[in-house]
C-alpha cells in the first residue's frame, strides 16, 4: 500500500468508522464504500432489534420477489448461472402455507418460533430487510422419498408462518410437480 492509499485507509477508519478490514476492502476495490456503509447501518439495526423482547419487534409482511432471474437468491452459494444449470426446470407456484408445513419432512419443519436462539440473528436481519421495504425470494422445495423439503428459504418460510401469511410462492422443479401435487395443492396465482 503506497502512502496515498495509506492516508485513504486511515481516513476511512477515522471518518467513516470502518474496521481496518472494511477499509482495506474499499481501498483494494473489493467493495464500494456506499455498500460497506449500508451494511454497517443494517448490522446496527439488527443488533438493536435482537436486544428487544419479541413482543416489541415489528411484524412486517413478506414481500415476495418472484422475478425468475433472481430465484437463485433463494439458495445460498448460487449464481444465476449455477442455479439455472442445477434447476433448469424451476417454476413458481403458490401454496397454502399451513398445508405445506403439515407435509414437510421432519427435518424441514421449524418447531421453534423465529425468535429462538437458533434463528434469532437471521430473523432479525430478515425483519430489518422487510421493514425497510425489501423483498425476498421465495423458498425452494423439493420432493424425495422422505417427503417435502425446504432447500432454500427456511427463515423466510418461518417468518411468513409466524405472521400467518395464508399463501406463499415457492419454487419447485417442473419435473417434480406431479409428485408434489399429490401432497399439497399447487396454484399458479396468489389468489
Positions of PLM-derived features:
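Basic- and aromatic-enriched surface patches that contact anionic nucleotides/nucleic acids
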Residues: 1-30, 38, 144-191
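N-terminal extension/subdomain marker
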Residues: 1-78
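Short alpha-helix boundary/capping and kink motifs at helix termini
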Residues: 2, 26, 30-56, 85-151, ...
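Proline-rich intrinsically disordered, low-complexity coils
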Residues: 20, 58-61, 68, 88, ...
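Short linear motifs in intrinsically disordered/low-complexity regions
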Residues: 77-78, 97, 188
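Membrane- and cytoskeleton-facing regulatory interfaces of eukaryotic small-GTPase pathways
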Residues: 78-79, 86
Amino acid at each position: 500500500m503506497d502512502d496515498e492509499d495509506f492516508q485513504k485507509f486511515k481516513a476511512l477508519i477515522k471518518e467513516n468508522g470502518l474496521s481496518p478490514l472494511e477499509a482495506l476492502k474499499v481501498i483494494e476495490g473489493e467493495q464500494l464504500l456506499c455498500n460497506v456503509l449500508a451494511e454497517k447501518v443494517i448490522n446496527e439495526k439488527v443488533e438493536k432489534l435482537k436486544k428487544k423482547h419479541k413482543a416489541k419487534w415489528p411484524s412486517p409482511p413478506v414481500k415476495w420477489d418472484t422475478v425468475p432471474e433472481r430465484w437463485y437468491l433463494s439458495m445460498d452459494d448460487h449464481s444465476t448461472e449455477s442455479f439455472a444449470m442445477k434447476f433448469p426446470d424451476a417454476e413458481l407456484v403458490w401454496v397454502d402455507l399451513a398445508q405445506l408445513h403439515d407435509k414437510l419432512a421432519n427435518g424441514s419443519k421449524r418447531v421453534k418460533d423465529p425468535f429462538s436462539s437458533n434463528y434469532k440473528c437471521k430473523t432479525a436481519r430478515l425483519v430489518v430487510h422487510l421493514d425497510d421495504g425489501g423483498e425476498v425470494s421465495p423458498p425452494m422445495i423439493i420432493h424425495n422419498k422422505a417427503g417435502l423439503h425446504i432447500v432454500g428459504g427456511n427463515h423466510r418460510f418461518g417468518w411468513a408462518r409466524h405472521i400467518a401469511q395464508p399463501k406463499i410462492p415457492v419454487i419447485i422443479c417442473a419435473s417434480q410437480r406431479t409428485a408434489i401435487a399429490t401432497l399439497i395443492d399447487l396454484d399458479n396465482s396468489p389468489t
